[in-house]
Amino acid sequence: WRWALNGGLTLSHGWKPETGFLRYRWEGYSEALILYVLGLGSPTHALSARSYDAWTSTYRWKKVYGHEFLYGGPLFMHQLSHIWIDFRGIQDAYMRRQSSDYFENSRRATYVQQQYAIRNPKGFRDYGAHVWGITASNGPGPATRRVRGVTRRFRAYLARGVPHGPDDGTLAPWAVAASLPFAPEIVLPTLEHCGHAYPHMENEYGLVCSFNPTFPVPGSKHGWLSKDHFA
């Protein structure tokens, strides 16, 4: 783990045999939470507390739509580390200062997602209290289309996020489902609504990984639908 610091305090984004260390580092709150926990727990080459503090010093605490939380735009950032650790009641120095924990932070991030969809600042089709889920996902692009008098640029795979974007109207139902532990009171109604409003999204493999109602598709009243699934 100390090797992965590449001479710095925060972890390198990665290493390739052909080119060596990547130029970027794991800084700012993200799915790297589990990475730093693993590094701190190593019995032989552990990261130091100084390294962890250097990472948390890059955090951004924001108030969005009335919710104060540790900011991360894409929803997956608030979900992946929780697959392995139940963070309820676990606080580091940063979260103690905020009187919160990472589980509560993910709950607030889920509500921010819903509120963004309700406000729908960019005017995408279908966004609302029961249609949200903006995260890293496949998209219908790269393409530019004129939709209801507005020129819109659509992306392919991209880490989409709220409230600062990027956002091109692409939604991921799996991201909603993955928020079930944090906010079941808004997740379950959303999944139920999507099951009725978008029955074409589900097949024998489950839900498709993403869809975009705003992207015009000839012969379809539902817009773009990904052909991929997440297992």
List each model region and its residues.
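Ser/Thr/Asn(+Pro)-rich, low-complexity disordered segments
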Residues: 1-231
